[in-house]
């Protein structure tokens, strides 16, 4: 079969129009290649993805890299297939870009198999209908906002409250406890942070259990709008062909939408609310519907969500919310108390915090813990103005227990051992439930509150109390 060539007819930023001979139009989503000497000296080094058909013999494409240096009339090769990325175990420990090329200077990936990045969501009959919790070994998450296997979790937090450390601990725990793999998609975030994550994962020994796919802030919008799909295809291979329970991290899902809106106007679509693309909900749905549990395995995804101007009603975060099963909200006030992970126990939610899924005992203890913490929050104004002495005996007891709960919700992480100096702890769910049940029931009212800070189980807290007393 002879190769199909076209030629560039116009270049509009990240969008490029290509003319073909009549009857030879490449289908939508096909990858075309063109030589851009401004990138490097390789031939056909720039990938264009077909987005629209313009009449009989022209297509409009989105570029996956810089278009500086392209000229009209240049030859464009139709590869005859979608953008495809290498999948399988060879991708572990590697950093790939949106088109599946390694960018870590460690040689070619040499994977046996490739997947196209646009794939159908699993058919309804293949999806698993069983709802079950996915234990992370992190007390505050497992107790108050448990993750669902095959669910989608939104991770909210400002700068510097510990999103990355929490993500790394989850990667570590899933690798060690479940033997599972993780895929990390860096979508439109800082290159420095991507590099830091890679270095830290190397140091903490979790790199060989994860594949990293980066399309950072400096990349053109085409790459940022597709890199999440590339990472998802790698995760789907582990789920569908190896029957694994995979963890997929997307940092940051807002940038996926942002990139789509940058390209949308160039493609000639009329913008909708707040200047976003009219296809916002469709694009988000195509990505999110592929993240699910099937009868073979599951993809559980944790997505960091940037909220523009802290406005939760902005169309981008609001569209993402529709897909979430649980939210983990990181709070600066809690981080300021030195309590890590700085998860807000009253703001974080989960769809499966339901006695029918997690059981009556777990549910009732979670609700009691939230009640005590909420009561403490309500009393804080009184304490600030009048002091502790003005509280009733009953309220004093609530405050004392709440402060113990607050401290017991912290725990040392494996990936932060270098900073904290204390070994990381993975806490089994039954130990978490037992510990909080005893605190709420008042079994440890005589134990000083600092004994509960940065420990794993309740037994460790009591050990620590003995040391403090000695």
UniProtKB/Swiss-Prot annotation:
Keywords: ATP synthesis, ATP-binding, Cell inner membrane, Cell membrane, CF(1), Hydrogen ion transport, Ion transport, Membrane, Nucleotide-binding, Translocase, Transport. One of its GO terms (cellular component) is proton-transporting ATP synthase complex. GO terms for molecular function: ATP binding; ATP hydrolysis activity; proton-transporting ATP synthase activity, rotational mechanism. InterPro entries: AAA+_ATPase, ATP-synt_VA_C, ATP_synth_F1_bsu, ATPase_a/bsu_AS, ATPase_alpha/beta_chains, ATPase_F1/V1/A1_a/bsu_N, ATPase_F1/V1/A1_a/bsu_N_sf, ATPase_F1/V1/A1_a/bsu_nucl-bd. It is found in: Cell inner membrane. Pfam families: ATP-synt_ab, ATP-synt_ab_N, ATP-synt_VA_C. It comes from the Bacteria. Its EC number is 7.1.2.2. ATP binds at residues 157-164. It is a peripheral membrane protein. The keyword Thylakoid does not apply. It catalyses: ATP + H2O + 4 H(+)(in) = ADP + phosphate + 5 H(+)(out). It is an enzyme of class 7 (translocase). F-type ATPases have 2 components, CF(1) - the catalytic core - and CF(0) - the membrane proton channel. CF(1) has five subunits: alpha(3), beta(3), gamma(1), delta(1), epsilon(1). CF(0) has three main subunits: a(1), b(2) and c(9-12). The alpha and beta chains form an alternating ring which encloses part of the gamma chain. CF(1) is attached to CF(0) by a central stalk formed by the gamma and epsilon chains, while a peripheral stalk is formed by the delta and b chains. Produces ATP from ADP in the presence of a proton gradient across the membrane. The catalytic sites are hosted primarily by the beta subunits. Belongs to the ATPase alpha/beta chains family. This is ATP synthase subunit beta. It comes from Geobacter sulfurreducens (strain ATCC 51573 / DSM 12127 / PCA). The gene is atpD.
